[in-house]
A protein has these predicted regions:
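Juxtamembrane boundary at the C-terminal end of a transmembrane helix
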Residues: 64-65, 111-117
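Core segments of transmembrane alpha-helices
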Residues: 45-62, 82, 104-105
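Feature marks short, highly hydrophobic, charge-poor N-terminal signal-anchor/signal peptide-like helices
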Residues: 1-6, 117
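Membrane-helix boundary connector in multi-pass membrane proteins
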Residues: 83-99, 115-116
Length: 117
């Protein structure tokens, strides 16, 4: 369960970052490929809040699977986390790569640990 809680905690951290973007934090260079270096435009803010909700759902899926629930949502979350990790690794934004590649790598490791435990 420790790995699942690590994963879920990092999902909450990521969701909090996305909510801050939605509210106008000038951190655009750290997300969405760095296309908007400061405040995201309205359309992209909507994407940020959707991402926040998505991250919370991923965290809940892995927690549920680790607590004896059906494993399918947890494995889907793990696979999606792997895709997110790859997206961060190849991001054109060096800021996004530097911050989110290591975070998503830890998330992927924690999700795999939780699902294989």
């Amino acid at each position: 369960m420790i790995a699942a809680w690590i994963y879920a905690g990092l999902c909450v951290v990521t969701a909090t970052f996305q909510v801050a973007l939605y509210l106008g934090a000038p951190w655009g260079r750290w997300t969405q490929g760095g296309r908007y270096p400061t405040v995201l435009p309205p359309r992209n803010r909507t994407l940020a809040i959707a991402t926040a909700l998505f991250m919370l759902a991923l965290g809940a899926s892995v927690l549920g699977a680790a607590d004896g629930g059906t494993p399918v949502p947890g494995w889907i979350a793990t696979g999606l986390t792997g895709a997110v990790f790859l997206g961060h690794v190849v991001s054109p934004s060096r800021f996004e790569r530097a911050l989110w590649s290591p975070v998503s790598a830890v998330m992927l490791g924690a999700a795999l640990w939780a699902m294989l435990a």
